[in-house]
């Protein structure tokens, strides 16, 4: 890493899948790294590299990147949803990133839903629970497999319920999807909108802009903009 770090680097921004203390750069519980408990990441890296370091949740970095450099740059109130091994969100209100007191404002996957939570039904766990993977289901759907298409339709219904929950809580102008599952949006979009017909405020759904992020490395761009 020392060969990659050039003398003209002015700052470092890092997004981690964890609740963090953004002001002090403390990482509390990184998903997938059990040993990372209350790691003072900002202090460690600033001592090593001698430049300011900014640490935030990875979904917040995604939202910051999308709102500054991507599809949401024209909107003030945006919720950016990362669909992958889990599901989380970054929230922009009035053009500013909203993190909550402990940077956990977007932990929507942990909200109870049906018999489990939204993460079980709106991430790759949905497909694993049905004996496949998101990648395999996507490839089968591309080939026209009826079973795979039906699976994505079911998934889209759950995403529609997730969007409804976001509308009730935040009433954003736009929702932008990202993550490894977002590229399959074309397979679950219709079912999502079918579910949204149940939302009681039709005008809200009509004016809501829903899309997928297309900017490459948008999370890295967001991390670079952290303050």
Q: Where are the language model's segments positioned?
A:
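Glycine-rich, phosphate-binding/catalytic loops in enzymes
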Residues: 29-32, 97, 193-195
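A charged helix-plus-loop insertion that forms the helical arch/lid used to bind
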Residues: 25-38
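Active-site-adjacent loop/helix segments that line or gate small-molecule/cofactor pockets in enzymes
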Residues: 59-63
